[in-house]
Amino acid sequence: MDRSLQVYICMYPYLDGSKQYRFDELISFYRPCPKSLDNIKSHYRQIHHQIRRRTHQHHQIRRRTHQHHHRSNCSRQRQCLVRHSCGRQMRVLA
């Protein structure tokens, strides 16, 4: 992974709810880390789609009890927090 660009993405928690996926944990399962911000969105969408497929049944169960409580928070757009080596942070809608 390119350490000059550390990327942490808010994604689905692990199924036991213990923690959230970290971007550099995910890329070891899928494909090499994108080297530029231009590639992060499309890369994130691919990972997001694969995880959605794998956890679809789990989310169908959770959605029945969860959706009416936080309907506005359950949008499909998730925010990526991009942290550069210089300390600058920016949020990217994926």
Curated annotation (Swiss-Prot):
| Signal sequence bounds | none
The sequence repeats extend over: 48-57, 58-67
Question: Where are the membrane-spanning stretches?
Answer: none
GO BP field: amino acid transport
Q: What is the induction comment? A: Repressed in presence of ammonia.
Keyword Ion transport part of the UniProt annotation: no
Its domain of life reads: Eukaryota
Q: Which UniProt keywords apply?
A: Repeat
Function, as annotated: Involved in ammonia regulation of the GAP1 permease.
Question: What's the name of the protein?
Answer: Ammonia regulation of amino acid uptake protein
State the organism named in the record: Saccharomyces cerevisiae (strain ATCC 204508 / S288c)
The record's gene field reads AUA1
